[in-house]
């Protein structure tokens, strides 16, 4: 689901910021 993808990619995005 969308939330599953969000939880999966959000930490990755935060690391790149």
Curated annotation (Swiss-Prot):
Superkingdom of origin organism: Eukaryota
Keyword Secreted among UniProt keywords: yes
Protein's recorded name: Osmin
Tissue: Expressed by the venom gland.
A GO term for molecular function: toxin activity
GO CC, alphabetical: extracellular region
Post-translational modification comment from the UniProt entry: C-terminal amidation is important for activity, since the non-amidated peptide shows weaker hemolytic, antibacterial and antifungal activities.
Keywords: Amidation, Antibiotic, Antimicrobial, Cytolysis, Fungicide, Hemolysis, Secreted, Toxin
Compartments (UniProt record): Secreted
Keyword Secreted: yes
GO terms under biological process: defense response to bacterium; defense response to fungus; killing of cells of another organism
Function: Synthetic peptide exhibits hemolytic activities (less than melittin) and inhibits bacterial (M.luteus and E.coli) and fungal (F.oxysporum) growth at micromolar concentrations. In the context of inflammation and cancer tests, is weakly cytotoxic to normal cells, induces calcium signaling but does not impact cAMP production. In addition, prevents LPS-induced nitric oxid (NO) synthesis but does not affect the IP3 signaling and pro-inflammatory activation of endothelial cells. Does not show significant antiproliferative activity on the breast cancer cell line MDA-MB-231.
Post-translational modification Valine amide, affected residues: 17
Originating species: Osmia rufa (Red mason bee)
